[in-house]
Amino acid sequence: MNRHSTLLSLALLTLLVTGNLLVFAQQGLVANNPAELLRVGDKVIKINDAISMVQGFGNTFMVSTSEGNVIIDTSSVFHARKHHELLTAENKSPVRYIILTHGHGDHTGGVPLWKEAGTQIIAQKHHVDFMNYQTRLAGFYAKRNAAQFALNIPEPARWAGNYAAKIEPTILFDDKYEFTLGGVKFEICSAPSETYDHLMVWVPKYKALFSGDVYYESFPNIYTLRGTQPRWALDYVNSLNKVMSFNPEIVIPSHGMPIRGNAEVTRRLTQYRDAIQYVHDEVVKGMNAGKDVYTLMHEIKLPANLDVGESYGKLIWSIRGIYDGYVGWFDMDPVTMYDTSAASVYPDVVKLAGGPDAIARLALQRIEAGDAVAALHLTDIALAADSSNRSSLEARLKALEILQARCKNTNERGWLDYSVRATKASLGEKH
């Protein structure tokens, strides 16, 4: 591994333990190369005379007052230095406060750069628990993110302990916290959504609301493929209602560009809220009607007027996230109560079918019929009996490449790319 690759790996692993691909999804892009994630904003964007931002993997915002600056979110470790350089060139006043909308690494990565003697750092009280949760599973997430972003899989990490996170905030609050600096009032409210430590910031003087990740230009990641604690759909709904209750003239998300004008804010956030509410309610109705999660994943579709796009979050993942979040993993099938997986009997099925080549032929038939996902299931069965069976690996690669070619979701693309690389490696191909 050369020096550039090493630096790239270190930067991405640090960044991606808690980050995401949202910036690419919002631009309608699918990241095909890990280096694409490291593009740094190269200019300051003036939202108004007092509020400035720099875009990146996560945005950094500066609100300037006569008594000093307030920084809202600090981007990732990779972007933070450039963001700091650009914004301090704009205004060199002391940083009096740093406000963290939540504990993901693409919002907290620049705290050490912005923190000065006497700087107060504000977060919602659940920030402590959330940071400990992330640190507790740092090794797990490092492996997941390395897989998704084409990095070397790290060696197993030493467990740091249950409560080993570094806690930066000096002020923690429950529901609301307010302060005034240089005649500018800042009202901070709890807004659980993407995380349970999430907050938003209302600046009434400018009728501006910093919304963190309550809203972005895609259906939300109610479940994220890297794994996460439950994200509650109704938390999103309630927090979006709270955003709109301020009647803001400008909403400033931590990913993407501001939404300007109360009418446009109301239109977009109402559509977003109603889309989430619709999916949640349809899942709950289906659960109460006795439908299983796969039936609901197949049946539930957004009405055209609520279609907010699926470039980042995806409907079927959110449906399953809502379902499993409410009731967990037991599906009423007694076999799932025990510690023997379905895959453990796949070799018996393969033997009965006449060997893995026979299953591979069936997978190819499914591909020809247009069902690449069913083909993947069949290759799972075949490869459980013989992990090096070439015809099964070739069928698997063909199915994956079909899914890859039609993929329009950034997170989905990352995992398809990972599986393509792994399958090619098993076939002895370079990638």
Each model region followed by its residue ranges:
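Bacterial N-terminal signal peptides that target proteins for export
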Residues: 1-11
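Bacterial N-terminal signal peptides
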Residues: 9-20
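Accessory terminal helices/loops
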Residues: 16, 25-34, 140, 245-250, ...
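Metallo-beta-lactamase
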Residues: 27, 46, 69, 76-78, 94, 129-190, ...
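Conserved beta-strand hairpin/beta-sheet module of binuclear metal-dependent hydrolase folds
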Residues: 41-90, 200-213
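Active-site metal-binding motif and surrounding structural segment of the metallo-beta-lactamase
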Residues: 44, 66-67, 78-123, 172
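Divalent metal-coordination and catalytic microenvironments
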Residues: 50, 63, 73, 102, ...
